[in-house]
Amino acid sequence: MPNPSSTSSPYPLPEEIRNLLADVETFVADILKGENLSKKAKEKRESLIKKIKDVKSIYLQEFQDKGDAEDGEEYDDPFAGPPDTISLASERYDKDDEAPSDGAQFPPIAAQDLPFVLKAGYLEKRRKDHSFLGFEWQKRWCALSKTVFYYYGSDKDKQQKGEFAIDGYSVRMNNTLRKDGKKDCCFEISAPDKRIYQFTAASPKDAEEWVQQLKFVLQDMESDIIPEDYDERGELYDDVDHPLPISNPLTSSQPIDDEIYEELPEEEEDSAPVKVEEQRKMSQDSVHHTSGDKSTDYANFYQGLWDCTGAFSDELSFKRGDVIYILSKEYNRYGWWVGEMKGAIGLVPKAYIMEMYDI
């Protein structure tokens, strides 16, 4: 056992040991830092931190170029192995998670004030570490607001730690980022000549949901299909160049609405309210044929404003923030639309939902 008082390493520190110390210090110094620990656990944490510092003092030669773990200065690891995909990509990581975003492109905004949040939750974000670890994973509250990805220390933060516009990026699952039990929970957002952002979700399912939501927005941004124009109330404007595929009545007291319905193919539109149940079934049978363009039908995605429990079997029940895809607005005059959520189709009160995207 080397003498702790020595100022240089008696022999090179094996890479496996350095990697182990990296994991231990990340867990003890960072992950446990914000946890509510018992007195005994806090004492043990401080003891482990001290032991790690002792090891660094013993192997001073190997760590002298890495600087103090708390000074925030960057370094290059002279003992790093041959470059691989991950190490090369790391040069494009967010080098300082606490620094302002690139070019101060977006103004500071509190996490609770973000508009049109499509997906939010806690993730572990990979970044360049400032100690001898090389890399670290830090817990961040992340949110996709419209087409901008924000990350915060917590969902109560008044200002983001960073953000980036996802335009031009691609997203994919990546199980090579970790070797522990969370390897199947990882995904990355990347683009040529831009920083790579890599995250770990709480579960593989959560990671897949992040990937699918990001892909949906990215595909919509790249699509040449222009969604139908809606006013602020979510009602459809008349298109003078093309006939409407289904009946979408305007909320208006003008009697000309009935004439519009009669000109459309669906004759059932003018049926009396007593036949609504039959129309509902026909509508729900037909909407399956119109949902194929869902990935690009940006304007028909809504989210719940309040919790709503359906009174009948043909009505959807949903919570505040739930994503609902609107399949039909043919019952607009009654205040109901036909929507789909998690594979279930039913009637949705339009007063209980709002547009997900600001078009």
UniProtKB/Swiss-Prot annotation:
Induction: By retinoic acid. The modification Phosphotyrosine is found at residues 75, 151, 197, 261. The keyword Phosphoprotein applies. The modification Phosphoserine is found at residues 5-6, 9, 87, 90, 223, 283, 286. Residues 14-64 are annotated as: Homodimerization. Pfam families: PH, SH3_1. Residues 66-88, 264-293 are annotated as: Disordered. May be involved in B-cell and macrophage adhesion processes. In B-cells, may act by coupling the B-cell receptor (BCR) to integrin activation. May play a role in src signaling pathway. This is Src kinase-associated phosphoprotein 2. It comes from Homo sapiens. The gene is SKAP2.
